[in-house]
C-alpha cells in the first residue's frame, strides 16, 4: 500500500486548508488519492481526444482548460495562476540577464556616456512593461474575440471587468473570507503551519513522482508540456478541496440527523438536569469525528451529479443519459 499511495501528507495538508481540523484516517486519504488519480486519468484521456480532433498528438494547456471551460470562476483562477507563474519565470530570467550584463559592464561610465542609475531605471521600466504585457497575454481560442478576423487594440490602462471576471473575483473573495475566519484566532505557530499547508501540491518539485503516479507515459504518446503538469497540479488541489468541503457539509448533515434521532430517544430525568439515557455500547460523549470514507463516497456521488441544465437534453435522446465521469 505504501508504494501505491504516495500523497498522504499532501492530501492531509489540503484537507486542513479546506476546513478539516482532525487528522483523517488512512482509509480516507487513500480513497481521496484514488479519486484524484481517476480524475487525472480522465482529464488526460479527454484532453488527448481534444488534441486529436484538432489534428495533433501532443496536449497543450488549452486542451486541458477546454474541459473545464463551463466553470468560469475556476478558469479565471487558473489563468491568474498561469500568468503569475510566467511573471515569476520572466522576472528570474531578466534578473539573470541583468546580473550577467552588470558583471561585464565595469564601472558606471561606459563608452556611451550612460550612468548606471539611468540604465537601471530604463531596465526597470522596460521590465515592468514586459511583465505587465506577459501577465495579460493568456488567451483562449474559444473566446468570443477569436471569432473575428480583426482583434481590438489592448489598452493597458483599461481596467473594466466582464461578468466572468466578476464571478471569479466573487468566488475568490468568498474563499479569502473563509480563510480569514479560520485564521483569525490562530497563534503565530498555527498560522505558519497553515501557510505551509497552503503550499501543498501534487506537482511542485515532484514532477517525476507525479508522472509515475498518474501513468502519463502510458496515457499519452508525446512528452507533456510543463504548463500541462502545472495545470494538473492546480486541478488536483481544487479536486481535493471540493471533495473535502462537500464531505464536511455531508458530515454536518449526518450529525444533525443523528442528534435529532438521539433527542427522540427516551430521556432520563433527575433533579435539575436532563440527559439522555446511556446505553451499554454507547461511546464517549466528546469524541473526535474526522471525515470517514462514507463521507467521501457521498461527496463524490454529489459532485458527480449531472447538472439539470445538461440533464434536460436527455428528453431529446430517448430519455437515456449516457454516464460519463464529471471533471471537478
From Swiss-Prot:
Is Nuclease a UniProt keyword of this protein?
no
Which domain of life does the UniProt lineage start with?
Eukaryota
Segments of this protein annotated with the region Disordered: 93-128
- Ranges of Gly residues compositional bias? 101-113
Where does it live in the cell?
Nucleus
Annotated GO CC locations: nucleus; SAGA complex
Record keywords, A-Z = Activator, DNA-binding, Nucleus, Transcription, Transcription regulation
N-terminal signal peptide: none
Under the heading Gene3D superfamilies, the entry gives: Histone, subunit A
A biological process from GO: transcription by RNA polymerase II
Q: Which Pfam families has this protein been placed in? A: TFIID-18kDa
Q: Does the keyword Cell cycle apply?
A: no
For this chain, one GO molecular function annotation is:
transcription coregulator activity
What this chain does, per the entry, is described as: SPT factors 3, 7 and 8 are required for the initiation of Ty transcription from the delta promoter. SPT3 regulates Ty1 as well as the mating factor genes. Interacts directly with TATA-binding protein. It is likely to be required for normal TBP function at a subset of RNA polymerase II-dependent promoters.
| Family membership noted in the UniProt record | Belongs to the SPT3 family.
- The name of this protein is Protein SPT3
Q: Taxonomic lineage of this organism?
A: Eukaryota, Fungi, Dikarya, Ascomycota, Saccharomycotina
